[in-house]
Regions:
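Short, basic/aromatic recognition patches
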Residues: 1-16
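A generic fold-level signal
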Residues: 16-18, 44
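Zn2+-dependent cytidine deaminase-like catalytic core
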Residues: 25-118
Length: 118
């Protein structure tokens, strides 16, 4: 998680109205990918990190600095991208204060048998 926080910190002020978020993907105790919210807030960190993995995320763990979004806005929900990637666990450090996502991702991911912890 510390690496994800460092990624987010380095991108502060460059993500428009979106928060700067860091994401790290770990499989078999090794970092296989990472991402950060892109310039002007899109794509989100989870999408950036998962795209780099090229479908190698089955049974992996995601560490992300903010609860993954679960609503349709200017991008599809990160929860959808996470579900399609077949990750096993998602850890996030802060719940999203946006009421469209607040605490929803835990419910959505858990319903798909993806363990979530904040």
């Amino acid at each position: 998680m510390r690496f994800a926080i460092n990624l987010a910190t380095n991108q502060n002020g460059l993500t428009g109205t979106n928060p700067s978020v860091g994401c790290v993907i770990v499989k078999n105790k090794k970092i296989i990918s990472y991402g950060v919210t892109s310039l002007n807030g899109r794509p989100h960190a989870e999408t950036v990190a998962l795209k780099k993995c090229k479908n190698n995320t089955s049974k992996s763990t995601i560490y992300v600095t903010l609860e993954p979004c679960s609503h349709y806005g200017k991008t599809p929900p990160c929860t959808n991208v996470i579900i399609k990637s077949k990750v096993k666990k998602v850890y996030y450090s802060v719940e999203d204060s946006d009421l469209r996502s607040f605490n929803n991702s835990k419910k959505i991911l858990s319903s798909k048998k993806i363990s979530t912890k904040s």
